[in-house]
Amino acid sequence: MKKYLLFNFKTNPSNVIQLKQLLKVFQGYSPKITEKFKVALFPPDIYLIESKKNLKAKFILGAQDVFWFNKIQATGEITPLMLNSLGVQYIIIGHSERRRYLEETDEMINWKIKACLNNKLTPVLCVGEQENDKSGLIPNFRTKQEIFEQLNYAFRGIKINPPAGGTNLMIVYEPVWAIGKGVSQDLKASQAIIALIRFWLSRRFGEAIAKHLPILYGGSVNHQNIKEFLSSKDINGVLIGSASTNKIELSKIFKQLTTNN
């Protein structure tokens, strides 16, 4: 199965001209990169149409957020139907920056996941601990509790059917303390947390779901560490943040992944 490369542009770039220049970098490494990986781009909503027009290869279009209702007056929000009409397939849900800066609650995250599933959109749920757990390969109680609580709230009232070649959602393990800091989680420690998430999934949804649901790593992914994370059989891909809109770093990532070295 192909691994996932998810590129979260956040609030970048600053204008459409810069966006087109950035998308040329992605196009320049296709189809090599899309033959090896499932590649999804998550530009700001204002750039979704322009991104769709400028992406000719098999790139997947994603959005950074969604509102949880289709038919309600909510100024400034984007509904699932709107995103569907633009060809969006993936939606990032519960990113720590939204939890922190916009006070997005666990209840809202649960509503958004349900809205995605009800509208044939794939939610990409982000979970992770606030503080660096330095206890080694066995996550400490605080970390376990924090991640289990996020999962319990996110999947409240949600049923997932046994997969027929895959599932219609994915999870990103993103240690909050590593986001944007230039320091990623240790690979073995990341694998331990991902194993913990799979354990929770097996208890909640069964072994088949736990085995097939994609779990990715996110948090200061760059050209120096991306191959290490992708080499792990326990990690199904990566969510790339700051490096997504740095053309030099992006080129280094693609060179790492498209050359045999």
Predicted regions and their residues:
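Active-site loop-to-helix "anion-binding N-cap" substructures in soluble metabolic enzymes
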Residues: 1-161, 166-261
